C-alpha cells in the first residue's frame, strides 16, 4: 500500500518564488530517487467558516501563505529505503538559515494510505 509524507508550513508571500524554485529542484531529486508523486500547493481558499482554518492551525502571520505538500511512495519500506539517499544528495544541501520559511514551524509526518481510488 502507498505511503505519504505530508507537510504543512507557512512561507512569507515575498519569498514564495524562492520557495517554489527550491521545491521544484527538491521534487526532481525525490522523483529521481523513486518517489511516485511530489506536490507543493499554496493556500487559495483556506479561510473557511467551519473547522479550524489552515491559517489559524499554522499560526500564519500577516504576509505569510500556507503551503500544503506531500510526497507519495510505494510503501513505508520504499520511503525508508530511499530517504537516506535523498538526504545525502548534494543538490539539496542548504544552510537552514537560507531557507525561505521557518523550519521550526513546519509540521510533517508519515501517513499510511487507507483509501486510494
What are the residue ranges of the model-derived segments?
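Short, well-ordered beta-strand segments in beta-rich or mixed alpha/beta enzyme
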Residues: 4-11, 50-86
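Short amphipathic alpha-helices in soluble, non-transmembrane regions
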Residues: 20-26, 82-90
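Long, hydrophobic N-terminal alpha-helical segment
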Residues: 1-25
